[in-house]
Amino acid sequence: ILKQMSQFLDWCVGEGELTANPWEALKVKERPDVHPHGVLKDAQVSVLLRAKDRVLHSAVLFGLLTGMRSGELCGLMAEDITAKGNLGRFISIRPNAVRLLKSKAAEREVPLHGVLEQLLDTTLPTSGRLFPHLTVDKVVKRYAYLRRRHPELHGTVFHSTRKWFITQ
C-alpha cells in the first residue's frame, strides 16, 4: 500500500497539488528472517518422555503420537473418540464447543496409537474434556518451564511434537 500511496502523492506533485511527496523518504523495511522452531530430535523426545511432567505428560504423548496441535488437544472431548471395530479407535478432530480449528482442512480423523488407547482406558476422563485443566496458554507456559528445566529442549516448542510426528 505504501507504494501505491507514494505513486498517488507523486501524481499530486505532478498535478501541482503538492510541492513535494511527503512520503519520498519513507522506506519499507525488509521482512525479518523467520527462525521457525525446530523439529524435536529423538534424544529430545526421550527427555520429554522421561520428564513425565505432571501437567503436560499426557498431552505430550498425544502430540507426539497423533501430531495434533495444542489447541486441538486442549479442546479434545471424550466424545471425539470413536471405535471402528477391528480398526481400533480414532480421534475425530472437528470444531466443537471448546475449540475452533485452524482451517477447514484441519478437520480429520486420526488413528489412536495403542499407548494412547491405554491412557484413555486408565487415566483420562471418560466424558467431557480429556484435558480439562489445559488451555493453549498453559501448554505454552508449561512447555517453557520444561525447556528451562531441560536445556537440551532449547529451540523447541510444544508444536515441535507435531513436527516430530510428521517426520516419523
Please report, for each region that a protein language model flagged, where it lies by residue:
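Basic, Lys/Arg- and aromatic-enriched nucleic-acid-binding interface segment
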Residues: 1-3, 14, 18-76
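N-terminal core-binding DNA-recognition domain of tyrosine site-specific recombinases/integrases
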Residues: 1-10, 15-17, 134-138, 154-160
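Short, basic/aromatic-rich helical patch in the C-terminal catalytic core of site-specific tyrosine
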Residues: 5, 9, 73, 143, ...
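Active-site/catalytic core of tyrosine-dependent DNA strand-transfer enzymes
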Residues: 96-97, 111-154, 160, 164-165
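Tryptophan-centric aromatic hotspots in well-structured domains and transmembrane helices
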Residues: 1, 57-58, 89-91, 119-121, ...
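Exposed loop/turn and edge beta-strand positions of beta-sandwich/beta-sheet ligand-binding modules
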Residues: 34, 56, 87, 106, ...
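Conserved tyrosine-mediated DNA breakage-rejoining catalytic core shared by Y-recombinases
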Residues: 25-30, 66, 75-119
